Each structure stands twice: as C-alpha cells, then as structure tokens.
Amino acid sequence: MKYISFFIFTTSLSFFTFAQPNGGSGANDTDLQLNTITTSLPFMAITPDSRAGGMGDAGTALSPSSTSIYWNTSILSFAKQKSEISMSYTPWLRQLTNDISLSYLSAYYKINKTHTVGGSIRYFSLGEITFTDASGNVLRDDKPSEFELTGAYAFRLAKKLSIGINGKFAYSNLTGGMPIAGVNSKAAVVGATDLSFTYYNDEAKLGKTKGVYTFAITFNNIGNKVAYSELSKRDFIPMNMKIGNAFTADFNSYNKLTFSIDLQRLLVPTPAKYEFIDGVNTLLSGKPNDIGIIAGMIQSFSDAPGTVSKDENGEYIKNADGTYKVEKWSRLKEELSEINIAGGLEWWYNDVFALRSGVFYESKNKGNRKFLNLGASLKYNTLAIDFSYLASLSGRGSPLSNTLRFTLRFNIGGVTTAKVESN
C-alpha cells in the first residue's frame, strides 16, 4: 500500500505543478530568462512509438512491449509475451517540411524467467537539402541522415525487481562531408548506454480495485560528446533521466485503465549567463559547461544561473566579493523548470481496442513544448496497430503541431508463464 500512496502523491504533485505554470508565489516562467538547453543528436530523444506518443510521452512505467527498449529495458523482464517485434513511423515537423521522418524497428526475446534480450534500429531522415556556397551557388543536393543501433538486456533480480542495460551506437552525418564556412566537416559517432530499474507489483490494490503498479527510473543516452569538425566545440548528446509511475486498474475481465506519470529532465549542463562588459565576455552567473560527461551529469542538478539582478539604470548589481547578484530563489526556480512533466491515460476493452490521451509540459524558458496527445489501438490475435496524434498547446505555429505516429506490433512467440519466486 505504501507504493500506491507514493504513486498518488507523485501524481498529485505532478498535476499540481502542471496546472500552475503561471501562478504561485513568484515561481512562474516570467520570472526567469530564456535559457534553453541544446544538445547534439537530438533525434536520440524523439519518442518513436505511438503508444507512449498517445499518452503525453509518459512511457517509462508502461506495461512491457518491444518499444520499451527506448523507454525502459528493465521492464521487459515482466513481459507476458515470449517475444515481440514492432515497426514505427513518424513523419516529423510536417508544419515546416514534408520529407523529414523517424523510423524505428525494435524486438525482444525472453530467454527464460530471468534473462531477456532485445534490440532496435532508429533511422532519422532529414530529407533533401541543397548545399550552396557563400555566393548562393548550388554545390550539390544531399539527403542527410542519422541512425542508432541498440542492444538491450534485462535481468530479473527478484519477483518484483529488475534492472536493464542498453548499449548504443549512433552515427550522424548532417553535411555529407561538405566544408562549412571553409572548415572541413565530418560525421559524428557516438557510443552510449542506458541504465534502468523497475519495481513491478502485479498484486497491487487501489482501494478495492486490483491492478498492477510500476515504478521505474531510467538514465538514458549516457555517452561521449561529439563535434562535426576538428575546430568546433564538442557538445553533449541528450543524456536524460526519467522517473515513471503507472497503475493499471483491472475493473473486470473487459475493462482496464492505466494512469501514467513521468518526470523527465536532461542530464546536461545548463548554459551559464555571460555578458560583454567593457569589451570582455564576463561570466555573470552559472558554471562553465566545457566539462566531461560524468561531471556534466552531476553539475546539471545545480548549475542554473537564475536571473541576474539589475539596478534602476539597467546595470548588473555586484556583490561585495565581486560576483554578480542573482535574484533570490531564481536559481532553484530554474532548476525546477528543467523538469518536464508527462501524464497519460489508457483504456483497454477486452484486450482488443484501446483509447489513449495525455499531456506534456515543458517550461517556456526551456523549450516551451506543451502538447495534448490522443491515441488508439486495435488488436487481433498476434497483430496490434497503434496510432497517435499530437496537438500543440504552445500557440500557433508550433512545428510539432499535428504530428502523427504509427506502430505495428507482432507477437511471434506466444505467452510465457514462467514465474520468479519471491526472495
């Protein structure tokens, strides 16, 4: 029962925060300055499947499927199916162009009650791009692309506990070797890993309603920094952490309802605040981010620069020790604003038909992604078809508006009945 109480508390806190992005005691977005965190290879963090894509991207603690390799490999230890393969397709940024897309192929296989293996291929096509010189003369047309290969392994520690690890190789070729601003460019190559942990209780109760409670933590895309030329600065890839809660209520043999909540944040340093003062690029607040991977992950929890104070003349105010004054609580407010909140619902009828809905919230100072998702599924024997639709809540002109996702899933191994005894 204590786990259900934690789920309710986390859910309530998340929706309270989502519902008050512009209210409260000065903790609103307008108190902070625009300070978006950017990374290289952002395609590694795009939701590939239409199930989580129909639930506000709250996929970390959802019941296992082949697309769990992206969200949370450790949950595959609790899969009811022996194996599954899925194919997903997402036309991307169709408000801007019509030839960018993400394709995703994933599969898993349960070796026995303890060991599960899987893999996935992610391919991101940026469409056709025309390269020109400084005078606007056409040099050539090219079709830049990026891809990622993932190997996955889940190990069941106990009846209700599991861990997972992914090994990844990613390749990003955005320029086709063309010189950019007179500098030779190159493809970016990444080696990365995902780590995940799941607590899974299929004997949970919410009041008198029986169901399944899942709590999961994942650390994703932990890998090397990359650059597209020998002279450019090496940038972080989208390393991130997700904390997920989900409860599936089994009302009867026909109806199941899942509530899912994710808290997500990048594990990448926040850009520091610099300003040219007397011709010198001066650090006003925050911390330099030209550091290593592990140091960057740790620093990401305490490096928000906040809002630097100004006097009535618009000049930055200095402290007695020569540092610059920062508005009270603004650093903490900015750190908290880096947490994205995702929530979703899923209703299944007779394990044949499903409807989904969800919301996603990101601070306007950190990217301003706010959207509503709708989704549906049809399942017949070993085949399932998933669909989702994204409606932007960030205002008119969002490039994410009207995003569609499609997924086909095939159960190719029957049902596994193996159980693990409680330790």
Segments the model singles out, each with a brief description of its role:
Residues 20-423:
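Subset of outer-membrane beta-barrel
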